[in-house]
Swiss-Prot record:
NCBIfam families the record matches: DegV (TIGR00762)
GO molecular function, one term: lipid binding
Protein's name in the database: DegV domain-containing protein MYPU_7660
Entry superkingdom: Bacteria
PROSITE patterns: DEGV
Keyword Lipid biosynthesis: no
Cysteine pairings via disulfide bonds: none
Pfam families assigned to the protein according to its UniProt record, in alphabetical order: DegV
Organism encoding this protein: Mycoplasmopsis pulmonis (strain UAB CTIP) (Mycoplasma pulmonis)
Binding site for hexadecanoate: 63, 94
Keywords attached to this entry: Lipid-binding
Residue stretches in coiled coil: none
Function: May bind long-chain fatty acids, such as palmitate, and may play a role in lipid transport or fatty acid metabolism.
Domain DegV intervals: 4-280
């Protein structure tokens, strides 16, 4: 039987126990750099300890997986499997995909799919691709076509409680930084073909209302939520998680998954942050 290998990275936010249950998956840890000290964002890390370090750090950076780790994963998987599917962090968020491509070009059976999936959605997509390839005898070309369709119909919005981490990362500067930090607004970030500001709200609840309306518009109306999985990815703020769950419950909706974000995500969004995605059911 033909076999499909999958390569993922720490943008999946996968835990150690979850990763141990996966077969034919390779993992690439992104790097977190706090005040000059580097940490690999591995599933085995104690995230809460690293969240605490992020809060205390004055200089926060992230970086690509180590090049030799990427090379080893690509080379080994290409020899072991008929085809290999790479589902990396989006190219508009990281240069990881460019480095992977350097090694993938040497192997015709390694296929990189640039996407804007978030967290456990990436793993679920990988598992479905394996099922289609190995059990349904789909070609890699058919799987890529399916991935393109799902990716196009998926969108994510983030609500952040503070702009401090965007400022530390150099993503806001000058007069704009001064105005936004003084107003204490909740920025809403849309993640699709890039990251862009989708709105600014004065309260967390109003940011959730804005996200709900944006999601409904994207899927063609409130009645279509039944055709999508609603997913929540969050930092260590229980208050924001509980608030989001209750808000969407009042709308008659439940999250199909609630996942604690990896440290490289929180390094950019801050601990008081959530992301909400719609992913079409399949």
């Amino acid at each position: 039987m033909k076999k499909l290998g999958i390569i993922i990275d720490s943008f999946t936010s996968i835990t150690e126990d979850e990763f141990k249950k996966l077969e034919d998956f390779y993992f690439l840890p992104l790097q977190l750099i706090l005040d000059g000290t580097s940490y690999e964002d591995n599933p085995s890390n104690d995230r809460q300890k690293l969240f605490d370090k992020i809060i205390q750090a004055s200089d926060i950076k992230t970086s690509l997986p180590i090049s030799s780790t990427i090379e080893k994963a690509v080379n080994e998987s290409s020899q072991k499997y008929n085809d290999v599917l790479v589902l990396p962090i989006a190219s508009f968020l990281s240069g990881t995909i460019s480095v992977i491509n350097v090694y993938a070009q040497k192997h015709k059976n390694v296929h990189i799919f640039d996407n804007h999936f978030v967290a456990n959605t990436i793993v679920e997509i990988g598992l479905q691709a394996k099922k289609m390839y190995e059990q349904e005898n789909k070609s890699i070309k058919e799987i890529i076509t399916w991935l393109e369709e799902i990716n196009t119909k998926t969108i994510t919005f983030l609500s952040l409680k503070t702009l401090d981490y965007l400022v530390k990362g150099g993503r806001i500067s000058g007069v704009k930084k001064f105005i936004l930090t003084k107003l204490k607004l909740f920025p809403i970030i849309q993640s699709y073909t890039n990251n862009s500001i989708a709105g600014l709200k004065r309260t967390f609840k109003s940011s959730l209302e804005k996200i709900y309306n944006k999601l409904a518009e994207f899927i063609g109306g409130e009645n279509n939520f039944k055709n999508y999985n609603l997913k929540l990815v969050h930092g260590p703020s229980k208050e924001m998680v509980d608030g989001a769950v209750e808000f969407f419950k009042q709308k008659g909706l439940e999250f199909s998954s609630i996942v604690l974000a990896s440290t490289v995500i929180i390094a950019h969004t801050g601990p008081d942050s959530i992301s909400i995605s719609v992913v079409p059911k399949y």
